[in-house]
């Protein structure tokens, strides 16, 4: 197993939370970025979502780079939001709206939607 990726849907608000993990032997190969981009395409395209967001542990900057690389914007920090290994940890929140996603696609591929 290389890893997993999912979106937890909130249909009432047309949004989803993106989550993923990649097994250590596969870190640094671009798998998370590639899979996350595919999820954005699916979420904003086929599913008609308006917003997709994600968070990562503050002490995992590699995951933050994945979120930035797929076009998400850092929106803030939730202090001591998660209890992991008997310690409360901060998480960094990222998000992307449909409008910004489509605008970025238009910049990269003018005239194609």
Label every PLM stretch briefly:
Residues 1-113:
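Acyl-donor (CoA/ACP) binding surface of acyl/acetyltransferases
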């Amino acid at each position: 197993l290389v890893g997993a990726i999912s979106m937890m849907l909130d249909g009432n608000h047309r949004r989803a939370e993106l989550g993923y993990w990649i097994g250590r032997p596969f870190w640094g190969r671009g798998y998370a970025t590639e899979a996350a981009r595919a999820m954005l395409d699916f979420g904003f395209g086929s599913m008609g979502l308006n917003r997709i967001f994600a968070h990562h542990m503050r002490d995992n900057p590699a995951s933050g780079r994945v979120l930035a690389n797929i076009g998400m914007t850092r929106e803030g920090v939730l202090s001591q939001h998660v209890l992991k290994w008997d310690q409360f940890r901060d998480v960094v929140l990222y998000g992307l709206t449909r409008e910004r996603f489509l605008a970025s696609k238009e910049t990269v591929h003018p005239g194609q939607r």
